[in-house]
Amino acid sequence: MTQLASAVWLPTLLLLLLLFWLPGCVPLHGPSTMSGSVGESLSVSCRYEEKFKTKDKYWCRVSLKILCKDIVKTSSSEEARSGRVTIRDHPDNLTFTVTYESLTLEDADTYMCAVDISLFDGSLGFDKYFKIELSVVPSEDPVSSPGPTLETPVVSTSLPTKGPALGSNTEGHREHDYSQGLRLPALLSVLALLLFLLVGTSLLAWRMFQKRLVKADRHPELSQNLRQASEQNECQYVNLQLHTWSLREEPVLPSQVEVVEYSTLALPQEELHYSSVAFNSQRQDSHANGDSLHQPQDQKAEYSEIQKPRKGLSDLYL
């Protein structure tokens, strides 16, 4: 379960971090829609955060939904002008104002109020912006004439969705695809890849978990035996050593031989002889226990002859 949770939450966390870095996830503050009449002037106020106080601000026109054509931008000064559009930064109150002069019906479109963010500012170079829908309506002032008037048909004018950029004929105007528009397709590709990895990892982890559950349900006794064997795996083997004795082998007798000596002592007389006899006790023990298979061939006796002692030495023998 721990591996399953980590496999699901890790891609989700990466996705949330990437969404946090998307342009517009920390938007500027301002109106979402503005409306003006033909020939009038229109001002839009955009508020930004204090950390963007020293950054350049710009106003651009959205093209093809993903590109933004730069109209006017504050590069080094707090105020810039391009044709009928003026932008002025107010660092004291953290706002900048965009002013349109002499609105026309072709000015109706979608615009962006944005702050220029460099690549080394910790936001991966994604600019902060928000979109504004600008609509322009015809002027309502009636045209009066002193003579008889003729009824003229009312012509309904529809607002165009696209139009030329303002101030395109002025010197120094830059009309190009802004860098944030170029980054957006790559960003969408990364998002799609992360979503694919998230779904694939989740399905794989869930499938592995289901397989384990199915195996445990089909063979409950096998899983129980395996658990018992794993718990008792240290006592499964015993080393046994057997010692055998050959039937042909005779028991080992003591290496030392006990010798019993018999001696007879008597008072010294003439022509007396003394003898001592020694028998092997090893042979007697083997006869008593029945372990010997053969009778001894002969018995050896040792004799010692003692002559009559000299006179005066008889007391020594006694």
Swiss-Prot record:
Spans within the Cytoplasmic topological domain: 207-318
Principal location listed in the UniProt entry: membrane
PROSITE patterns: IG_LIKE
Cellular localization per UniProt: Cell membrane
Tissue expression notes: Present on the surface of the majority of myeloid cells and a subset of B-cells. Present on the surface of NK cells after IL-12 stimulation.
Glycan attachment sites: 93
Biased composition (Polar residues): 284-296
Keywords: Cell membrane, Disulfide bond, Glycoprotein, Immunity, Immunoglobulin domain, Membrane, Phosphoprotein, Receptor, Signal, Transmembrane, Transmembrane helix
GO biological process, one term: serotonin secretion
Disulfide topology: 46-113
Disordered: annotated span: 139-174, 284-318
Biased composition (Low complexity): 139-148
All ranges on the Extracellular side of the membrane: 28-185
Processing and modification events after translation: Phosphorylated on tyrosine.
GO cellular component, one term: plasma membrane
Composition-biased stretches (Basic and acidic residues): 297-308
Quaternary structure annotation from Swiss-Prot or TrEMBL: Upon tyrosine-phosphorylation, interacts with PTN6/SHP-1 and PTPN11/SHP-2 and INPP5D.
Family: Belongs to the CD300 family.
Function of the protein: Inhibitory receptor which may contribute to the down-regulation of cytolytic activity in natural killer (NK) cells, and to the down-regulation of mast cell degranulation. Negatively regulates the Toll-like receptor (TLR) signaling mediated by MYD88 but not TRIF through activation of PTPN6.
Name this polypeptide is given: CMRF35-like molecule 8
Species this chain originates from: Mus musculus (Mouse)
